[in-house]
Amino acid sequence: MALVFNNVTVPQSGNVIYNGTSLSAVKMGATEVWKRQKTVYPGAPVANTQNLGYGPYFTVTNNGSDIKVDAFGGTERGWGRVILGPFSSAGYSKLYFSALRAYITNAFSKVSVSLGDINGNWVQRLIYHDTGESLGGYDVTFGSGDLFTINSANSNYYLILEVDSGATARGLNATIQMNGCYLI
């Protein structure tokens, strides 16, 4: 939620400075009325990349502000995950993406975005889609209006982006592309 003070709107991505100190939260009495968002990505490093399928069919492209995880399903299965972090969600209850696009054009394919550990074990799945036998047809972009509640007591997480494209010999993909992840 934005803070409006003297007709000036301060977004959660902005700064509130009081007596020369940058505040992370503003309270009115005992009620918190503004909290600065915490950036997970860009910022969180790639802690682990796991290629779980046919090596050449899994790619990760990361320029520091945009990350793309892609699995190609050809004669073999493309499957892998990138793990970003660690980061602490202590004091935050929700997560959102400024732009995360998940799309699948292949059958027997999946995309998954989860909170978990460095080994790729997920604690909470945020986004998951499995095409089963149908030929793709999944293309969704999640933005700042799509809030995900963090529902685990654990506060130390990694963000896991996982793609799996079936061995269908069709040469089609399962892809996740993200350019911002924030805690509020």
Located regions from the model:
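Extracellular carbohydrate-recognition regions
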Residues: 31-58
